[in-house]
Amino acid sequence: LKIVLIILAVILVFTFMYGMARINDVSMKPAIKDGDLVMYYRLDKRFVSGDIAVFKKDGRTTTGRVVAVAGDTVDITKDGLMINGATQISQDIYFDTTQFQNGVDFPITVGEGQIFVLGDNRPEASDSRIYGCINIKDVKGKAIAVIRTRGL
């Protein structure tokens, strides 16, 4: 009986605190590749720059790196990504940050209860440059682990 209760408790904790999602796009490559499983923590919706958010957009679950939070102003210029007037440089991003022709107009200020996300694979990412800020209510959680599924 104790073993059954322990197993039930583990299942309940995992179900309410954590989640798993298969990511079927290349927006976050190489950090998260097409087909990878992402484990996320559901209970903490406070994001800082650099966190990876797992969220629903257009009926599918995807991921993006948080670059701005409520109150921040995002601009994309010929110099690249700017947050609150400061150029952002990251050794982990291998591509220039550019605007999309049919995307949102910049600069944009992130509203209360929202985040602005970009994919690490900037040329192929479907991110806030296209659909704008993400409402926290659409966020499933904060990514905490990536499980590679290639070859499984």
Located regions from the model:
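Short acidic/polar alpha-helix capping motifs at helix-coil junctions
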Residues: L1-K2, M28-A31
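Hydrophobic membrane-insertion alpha-helices, especially the h-region
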Residues: K2-M17
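A short acidic/basic microdomain associated with nuclease active sites
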Residues: D25
